[in-house]
Amino acid sequence: MRLLSFIALCGIVMMFTACSNEDVAQGSVETNTANNDNLTTFVTGNPATRTSLNYDDGAFFWESGDYIYVQDDNGTWHKSSNAPTEKTASFKFKVPGKYTDHTSYKVYYPGKQGINNNVTISASQLQKTPNSTAHIGEVGDCGTADATGGNGVFNFRLDHQAAILVFQPFTENDAVKNCYLTKIEVTSDNDITGTYTLDTTTGELTGSGSGKTITMTTKGDGSYAQGFPLKTSSANVATNGTYVVIRPGTHALTVRYWIKDYVTQVEGAVTKTYPAFDYEKNDYYDMTANLNVTDYDGTKYYMWDAENNYWNGHEWNSAAPWQPVLKDKDNSNYPKSGSDSCYYRSTEGIGRDDAKYSCKKLPNANELAWYAEKGDARWDGERIWTTMGHLYKGGMWFKNKAFIKLTESFSESYGPGFYGDMRDNWGMISKSVAQGAPVGFFAERYFFLPALGSYSVGYLYKIGEEGCYWSSSAGNNNSNCGYMLEFNKNTVSVNTTGSDVGYYVMEFE
């Protein structure tokens, strides 16, 4: 994690043309604009001054709508009567009040949503273009300075009181590179957002904020209307650098990176955790993350025990693709006869018949029954995954074989309960499922099966809605069928189906 200081040096020239004779109760804000003779000029002349920053060198600039606040000799708060109208390296602020009694005055920048020394770090933040910091003054960046000097000339070095996280997600998954970053949710173990006060003595943020979560939306106009791109295989601040303002301090963070595939219309989050770390004021921190979404091989759809996959030679990523990659799309060039090596292996449906080719290493019918009956099947509609160049979500969690064996007689030779050996005698199971991913100490003893759908007569059916997985056991209740495990958000079942459908081939844990 790189951190860079962004202390900015500012100069103030205070030109006392007249003293204000207006008495205003302490705590109110005076913004006299009627007569410039009653104003003091605060000049910021350093080219690296304030409220937006350059990532590479830490240079700051004033942005449109930036105001400063100063307490005068009477203790009255005064807001500058003017502000920049565009990004600028220097600006002459006009500030009402009397400033002749002291050689030091504290200057406050409470952000664009603040007043006097009151600061709001927003729970909802918005950045419209990558690697832009024009918004940080809007969402809680703030600062103070002790202006010292005399004879009408005062200088100060602005001390920023917030911390900034610079998120730079990347991915090695080509399907994720086709997606966009739509928002980032940052959740802390303590407060990072809310209303705070800039202490009049130390200048630091004080008080307890009201929120532990900040949501940064990463959408703008034009080419960024859908979000920020995710096209790089390593961190690149120019591509999608996102700046989130937080309260400084020691925080353990959980970050959810929300991404969306606008072809499938699937949106979901990749979660990363960052251990407790002291995010100091006046600094910004690189928060890089590899969005390593699991990708499932689109060439693993087979008819039961076929020698080659359903679209062999014309897979989705081949030179001459026939394979549909989106739900309800089809291609008529699917396998149609036994002479095709992509066609299923013919079976008689009498007694046991074990797979010889593509399904040979898969769980058999008995094992599928154990997973369905005793595997605590849990539907997870939020887990995202990719296949064939696109983002999808949804699937089922099951206890792994070793975990089931701790309490059950998991066996390859017979099914649970009264089923006996389902390879010899037909049986079927259908059960309701629980909802949500497993949590707690034993969560790591589960494995996930994505809802990869299936192919039938060339159509891709219910991807993201159903999971359909072959076993190594042919059906014994009819010819040319095979045992399979099938699930959706409500049920999980083990049964036989026609061998001519393209189900997924995967070894289970």
Predicted ranges, named:
Residues 385-388, 392-509:
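C-terminal, surface-exposed recognition/capping segments
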Residues 2-373, 379-381, 387:
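Sec-type signal peptide cleavage vicinity
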